[in-house]
Amino acid sequence: MKFRVLGCSGGIGGDLSTTSFLLDDHILLDCGTGISNLTLAEMKQIRAIYFTHSHLDHIAGLPLLVDSIFDTLQSEALQVYGSKETITALQTHIFNNIIWPDFTLIPTKDNAVLSFNILEPGQLYQQQTCKLEMIPVNHVVPTVGYRFECAGGSMAFSADTTTNDSFWDRLNQYDSLDYLLVECAFSNKEIELCRLARHYCPELLGADLAKLKHKPKVYISHLKPGSEAVIMAECEQAIKGFDCQKLQSDQVIDIS
């Protein structure tokens, strides 16, 4: 499985885009502003999107994506997956005919271009060549991370979170983990803000990574614009025993 980073920043500005990852050309993990880095032809290949939570930096691209590839979706609806809370938020606050048209009814209810699907944590789901699982994490709105496993390897994504046991305990129940994408939004001087907004800083992340029995390659994402150098320098001090580096936009990771 090819894992392409479309956006991984904690904000926008210049060439920075928010969270969106492309898996094997057809699947998105979150749909932030990074989706705009795809060509229209690439967008038309997308068949499914898995969401971690309902915050705008992770969903902002979805309404415009559906509109842009509307003609393509008339032959096969775009499948959107997420927790019950995330799906409800999208239906209630975005596709409500006020912020954006309800594409689950367009062109007709029986032949709509958009379909919402609720997933349950702890269940394994097959998506093309890989299996995936939603894992609850600790953020200010209901949020899940994901673990993907293909024939040749495995990857986990923490989504937005702070100190928790659920994510790390579940990963430890598996025999292996090759890659870990984990957020670290703020520097250590903002530790109280991290606790309030439920994000990681290097100190909190280092403490949680120590719970993990595996030694995956670690990629740091969701850094606040302008603070990247400080956060990564602090990560070098706080995270011991892991090969750790900053995730880059347009980076491709081969999990197979």
Regions found by a protein language model. Give the residues of each.
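Active-site metal-binding loops of divalent metal-dependent hydrolases
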Residues: 8-9, 26, 31-33, 54, ...
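Divalent metal-coordination and catalytic microenvironments
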Residues: 3, 21, 29-30, 53, ...
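Cap/insert and terminal regions of metallo-dependent hydrolase folds
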Residues: 164-254
